[in-house]
Swiss-Prot record:
Principal localisation: membrane
Keyword tags: Cell inner membrane, Cell membrane, Ion transport, Manganese, Membrane, Transmembrane, Transmembrane helix, Transport
TM helices/strands, residue ranges: 3-23, 35-55, 63-83, 104-126, 140-160, 167-187
Gene responsible for this protein: mntP
Protein name stated in the entry: Putative manganese efflux pump MntP
GO biological process, one term: intracellular manganese ion homeostasis
Similarity section: Belongs to the MntP (TC 9.B.29) family.
Amino acid sequence: MGFYALLLIALGMSMDAFAVALAKGAAVRMPPRKIAATALVFGTVEALTPLAGWVGGFYAKPFISEWDHWVAFVLLGGLGLKMMREGLSGEAEDVRESKRESLWMTVLTAFGTSIDSMIVGVGLAFMEVNIAFAAAIIGMATTVMVAVGLTAGRALGVLFGRCAEFAGGLVLIAIGTWTLLSHLGLIQ
């Protein structure tokens, strides 16, 4: 898998966290230091969860290698549809919090937005990809997107939160479809 495909996956995976960051930014005014710390927590968690998913997928691979492209397609496509539905309906993660959110609550919120990345990690186990590089790209993209989301949230949270979720879902469906079609020899 090439760099640009990984970058698209990373941006797609960061959309959940971006949507939450927009909402947090709209609800709580944070100093730059707190924005940086929160973004790093989200990025770290988002980088670790695809590694965990990849390990599970890697060990399951010998048992389902004949269907691996279908597994990636179904996981990424299903996750993409879920994100699009949430983007349209507004069922995104709950962002209730106190003004002095603890590190523990930040980690839990980050984990809640990164469950999808674990599923992507399972799908990546069935593709030719350097998982450490992929996890690093996902983590960096999430760190940047959360920092941007928290900063811009006060003005843009209500307007773009749902659109970001929907766009992330579209990206995942496109990557899953590309994986399936390329494995079937329909595209290169």
